[in-house]
Amino acid sequence: NRSVNLNTRDINVTTDKNLRATETWLTNNSCPVDNPHFAVLELSTKAVKLLYAHSEQAVFSSSEFNFKNFVPDGRKTETGKGLDDQNVMDMDFFRARVLPVICNMKRVMKREGIDVVYSVATAAYRTAKNREEIIECIKSEADINVRILSKKEESVATMFAYGISTKYKKEIQESSHTIMIDQGGGSTEVSVFNQG
């Protein structure tokens, strides 16, 4: 199995630990919840996207993945347009265009009773030379931890998500080789999956 991301800047999983926090508890986590209601927040080059289950019971009792069990919410932010020609994010742009959407998504999660959110960021965040400042801004202003995905993590996540959610799942499982190309707003991932 091979995955290639054609974006040039990456995350070093050893040294960039401050960019690797994923989980944020929105409820009091000093009282652990047996079956927390969770959400995924994706901060992409083009948008901020939220996905959470209508009911975890429906998701986990279903024999296969079904988008009908989830509530998708997304807002176009054009985050990548805040990067200058040196790949530095204009923080005024970020605070005006992106941060309000993240804060609004947090309000939605609280209203929907989400206990924990897993937040990931992709190419624009990974590429930004001031990515630490961006992540700190999100943490201080929205109180949300964010994990910037490495190029490989983004490729593998795309391949996994497509593999469980596509109507061509059977064909993928029966194929000896599968090639996937994900052209996103700020990166292109090429994933090759070999069975056996």
Task: Please describe what each predicted stretch is.
Residues 2-36, 41:
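Non-catalytic pre-domain segments flanking phosphatase-related domains
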Residues 7, 14-16, 171, 175, ...:
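Compositionally biased, intrinsically disordered low-complexity segments
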Residues 19-33, 149-179:
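Conserved phosphate-binding catalytic cores of ATP/NTP-utilizing and phosphoryl-transfer enzymes
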Residues 32-145:
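Conserved phosphate-binding loops in N-terminal lobes of ATP-dependent enzymes
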Residues 41-47, 180-187, 195:
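A short acidic Gly-Thr/Ser loop motif
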Residues 99-108, 112, 166-186:
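A broadly tuned preference for mixed-charge, low-complexity surface segments
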Residues 125-135, 139-145, 151-159, 164-165, ...:
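Short histidine
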